[in-house]
């Protein structure tokens, strides 16, 4: 190392502290990367890889670099690739230092710690999540959005609950204890950590005393109890890992992270990963797009922070009637007063993302434009408060109280920062005239000096008679007089030559040099003073961060309420009655998303009645494409919307609180976990049967179709019986099936009812009426659906022939079903499993044909007679 240059020694010393990050090493106007970092970064960023002086072993040192003033898109590309970036700045002025300039890493940017708005999706959070579990079954989970300051923590009972919550949060980066790599936990977590940036924290961090000290240090001496985290155990360790990581990466700058929000699953309607996916709450199943999801429909918010809160409300519906009613009252007030709603939306339209502005200001990464955006946002609040002043809604009054316009802060920014400041702080032109006397004086000197230069140029042109004479400036020579070579004979004696060019000479004079020193000195001082004054203003704004955060949260909530009111008004939704009973009644319910996406068609509404009495389990039969899945999903979505506090797509609705919504809708192979379609289906079903309660809502679509017919109907039958007979798990259930045999359950189970999707037959065609009617379906209409799907006519005709054989119970003499032989086949086909719909008479005939009555003992004959009796 002694053979290395001082700069490379400094680089390697700093790099040693950040081995897992790409080090952006500031050299003048560039960030340089060396060695392995350079090789990796050049490949990801598609920039030139070069080399510089050889290192101690004689090899070239790989090198690449980017301009510091345009680093943002390059950093974003590295973060998107899952890399971490350590920003190493010069912390001394090179002009005032002899030798190597001192450098330090000022922050580390990771996928979970992005704060630059240009690298973030406005209506999506960017979470860093920490997960911890000791030898017990309780998992601690905390997550932070550094860009907004939102910090939450919970404890979850069991691995499945922890995995479900990680899937709901959708973090960009996850923090895990280093010991997880050794004790097998990492392998368990692979399905949820795949594709995530993962950081392992040293095990010593998970020490209770250290955790309490770290929490107290970050939150101004507050204890976990004072922060509302009393009673947490594993959750404290999850918090500690996040704070430790912040300390390591942000160098103490995270003052806007000033509170923790503890929560439990009991506070919200529980939705597992499968349910969120199947109901397409925030993304579509097919493409993973926002458009076409419930969020895509409901989000009419004006602000980015309102959009993020809307998603949070959808992911975490409420289970407290008071909170739901408060939201309903606020929405109803806006529905009934459209002019006030319109005025509110207009004012919100001028509000920037206060949460993320507040975050950048706290992290000292905000520019002057950010301060102006905050000023303009806060300036809208008096008008909003005036609109809310007459509200009768408890929630709207509370939100109004939480809004603080901070007039002194608005005045400070308005008086200190120009209306349209430049992006680059060091360029100057940020501070308004009249804000600082010294700055005003320096600007006057600068303006006067520039005026002098213009007058001097005119004077010299007159004195020399050289009309082409120019006074110019560059960073190397400062101000100079440029004269073309054709005019050199007219040069005065007091001109001092500075530089010879091909077609001109450059000169200075003592008078020009004197004014140069005065003007340039003033401009340097102006830039320094402006930056210092800007930092003072930004620091003052930082001190109001907690108030700004509360105000931003109130504005986001208002935005969501106005959005839900707009949706209710536009789509003619009703206010549901929500209580703590056992009834789920919906009159003329519609699927919110499908109705909105097919506005040219009339959506057929349907009624629903579920309870814990005579209508606990509804079996729904009918052909594919008739609308069974749509109906069941709409019931689940209406229930969820009601518990969000939203109005719902129906003419009337009475929704008793549910604790969980389960869905078993469709399936696909999970090759990553080595699970087949049927295995996925059975695992989801098992989860439902373990956790469903009488207060749950269960949606089951085609249980058992991933295996043989007899296996499938047996499983479906047993699942239905379990949900009916087991009082502990007797959830309100919608059960769609193609197994018509399941309709027999209504005969023996008093709380099971049969319904089907009405279909009209006409000229061998079917028309789906989309209406749910009482009773089981008489036909499956599979062949008609196949015709609609475009199967070849030959296949359709053969299917009809086979169906007739099945319905008549026709078999060949050797017991092989006639469906095994087509018209063109020859020879005997191997025996196959009989259809579920084989006639009982044929089964009886086969049994009789296969027995030898001459060899039966009396006891065997009696047993056989009993068996035959049961068969008929």
From Swiss-Prot:
Example of a GO MF term: damaged DNA binding
UniProt entry tagged with the keyword Zinc-finger: no
GO-annotated biological processes: mismatch repair
GO cellular component, one term: cytosol
Membrane listed as a keyword: no
Binding residue positions for ATP: 622-629
InterPro entries linked: DNA_mismatch_repair_MutS, DNA_mismatch_repair_MutS-lik_N, DNA_mismatch_repair_MutS/MSH, DNA_mismatch_repair_MutS_C, DNA_mismatch_repair_MutS_clamp, DNA_mismatch_repair_MutS_core, DNA_mismatch_repair_MutS_N, DNA_mismatch_repair_MutS_sf
Keywords: ATP-binding, DNA damage, DNA repair, DNA-binding, Nucleotide-binding
Family: Belongs to the DNA mismatch repair MutS family.
Protein's job: This protein is involved in the repair of mismatches in DNA. It is possible that it carries out the mismatch recognition step. This protein has a weak ATPase activity.
Name of the protein in its database record: DNA mismatch repair protein MutS
Source lineage: Bacteria, Pseudomonadati, Thermodesulfobacteriota, Desulfuromonadia, Geobacterales
Originating gene: mutS
């Amino acid at each position: 190392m002694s053979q290395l240059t001082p700069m490379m020694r400094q680089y390697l010393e700093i790099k040693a502290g950040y081995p897992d990050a790409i080090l952006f090493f500031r050299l003048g106007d560039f960030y340089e990367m060396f060695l392995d970092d350079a090789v990796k970064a050049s490949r990801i960023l598609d920039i030139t890889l070069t080399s510089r002086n050889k290192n101690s072993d004689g090899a070239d040192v790989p090198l690449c670099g980017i301009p510091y003033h345009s680093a943002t898109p390059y950093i974003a590309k590295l973060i998107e690739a899952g890399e971490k970036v350590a920003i190493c700045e010069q912390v001394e002025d090179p002009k005032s230092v002899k030798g190597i300039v001192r450098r330090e890493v000022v922050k580390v940017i990771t996928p979970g710690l992005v704060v630059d708005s240009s690298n973030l999706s406005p209506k999506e959070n960017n979470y860093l999540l920490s997960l911890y579990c000791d030898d017990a079954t309780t998992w601690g989970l905390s997550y932070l959005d550094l860009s907004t300051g939102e910090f939450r923590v919970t404890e979850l009972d069991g691995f499945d609950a922890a995995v479900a919550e990680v899937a709901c949060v959708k973090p960009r980066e996850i923090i895990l204890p280093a010991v997880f790599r050794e004790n097998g936990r990492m392998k368990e977590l692979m399905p949820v950590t795949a594709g995530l940036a993962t950081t392992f924290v040293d095990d010593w961090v998970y020490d209770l005393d250290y955790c309490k000290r770290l929490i107290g240090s970050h939150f101004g001496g507050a204890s976990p109890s004072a922060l509302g985290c009393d009673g947490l155990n594993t959750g404290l360790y999850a918090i500690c890992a996040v704070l430790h990581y912040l300390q390591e990466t942000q160098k103490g700058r995270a003052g806007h992270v000033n509170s923790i929000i503890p929560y439990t699953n009991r506070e919200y309607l529980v939705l597992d990963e499968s349910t969120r996916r199947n109901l397409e709450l925030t993304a579509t199943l097919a493409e993973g797009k926002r458009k076409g999801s419930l969020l895509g429909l409901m989000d009419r918010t004006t602000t980015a922070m309102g959009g993020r809160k809307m998603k949070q409300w959808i992911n975490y519906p409420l289970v407290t009637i008071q909170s739901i009613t408060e939201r309903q009252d606020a929405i109803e007030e806006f529905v009934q007063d459209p002019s006030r709603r319109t005025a509110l939306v207009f004012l919100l339209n001028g509000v920037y993302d206060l949460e993320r502005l507040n975050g950048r200001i706290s992290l000292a990464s905000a520019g002057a434009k950010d301060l102006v955006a905050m000023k303009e946002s806060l300036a809208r609040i008096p008008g909003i408060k005036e609109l809310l002043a007459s509200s009768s809604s408890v929630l709207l009054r509370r939100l109004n109280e939480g809004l603080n316009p901070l007039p002194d802060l608005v005045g400070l920014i308005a008086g200190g920062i120009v209306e349209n400041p430049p992006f680059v702080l060091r360029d100057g032109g940020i501070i308004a005239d009249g804000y600082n006397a010294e700055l005003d004086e320096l600007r006057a000197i600068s303006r006067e000096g520039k005026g002098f230069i213009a007058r001097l140029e005119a004077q010299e042109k007159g004195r020399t008679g050289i009309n082409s004479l120019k006074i110019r400036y560059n960073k190397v020579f400062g101000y100079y007089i440029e004269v073309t070579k054709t005019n050199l004979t007219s040069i005065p004696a007091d001109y001092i030559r500075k530089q010879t060019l091909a077609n001109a000479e450059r000169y200075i004079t003592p008078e020009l040099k004197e004014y140069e020193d005065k003007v340039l000195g003033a401009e340097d001082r102006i830039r320094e003073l402006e930056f210092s004054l800007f930092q003072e203003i930004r620091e003052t704004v930082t001190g109001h961060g907690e108030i700004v955060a509360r105000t931003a949260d109130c504005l986001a909530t208002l935005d969501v309420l106005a959005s839900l009111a707009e949706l209710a008004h536009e789509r003619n939704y009703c206010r549901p009655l929500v209580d703590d009973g056992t009834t789920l009644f919906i009159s003329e319910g519609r699927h919110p998303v499908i109705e909105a996406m097919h506005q040219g068609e009339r959506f057929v509404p349907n009624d629903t009645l579920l309870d814990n009495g005579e209508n606990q389990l509804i079996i729904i039969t009918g052909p594919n494409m008739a609308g069974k899945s749509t109906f069941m999903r709409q019931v689940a979505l209406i229930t969820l919307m009601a518990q969000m506090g939203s109005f719902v797509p129906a003419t009337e609705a009475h929704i008793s609180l549910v604790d969980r919504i389960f869905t078993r809708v469709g399936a696909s192979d999970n090759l990553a976990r080595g699970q087949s379609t049927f295995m996925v289906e059975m695992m989801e079903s098992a989860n439902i049967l373990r956790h469903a309660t009488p207060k749950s809502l269960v949606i089951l679509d085609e249980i058992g179709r991933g295996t043989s017919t007899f296996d499938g109907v047996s499983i479906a039958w047993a699942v239905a019986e379990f949900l009916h007979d087991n009082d502990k798990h007797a959830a309100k259930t919608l059960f769609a099936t193609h197994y018509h045999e399941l309709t027999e359950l209504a005969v023996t189970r008093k709380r099971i009812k049969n319904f089907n999707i009405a279909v009209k037959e006409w000229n061998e065609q079917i028309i789906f009426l989309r209406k749910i009617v009482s009773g089981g379906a008489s036909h499956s209409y599979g062949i008609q659906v196949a015709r609609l799907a475009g199967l070849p006519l030959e296949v359709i005709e053969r299917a009809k022939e086979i169906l007739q054989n099945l319905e008549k119970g026709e078999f060949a003499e050797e017991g092989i079903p006639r469906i095994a032989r087509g018209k063109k086949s020859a020879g005997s086909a191997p025996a196959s499993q009989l259809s579920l719909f084989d006639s009982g008479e044929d089964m009886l005939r086969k049994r009789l044909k296969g027995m030898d009555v001459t060899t039966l003992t009396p006891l065997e004959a009696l047993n056989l007679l009993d068996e035959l009796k049961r068969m008929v």
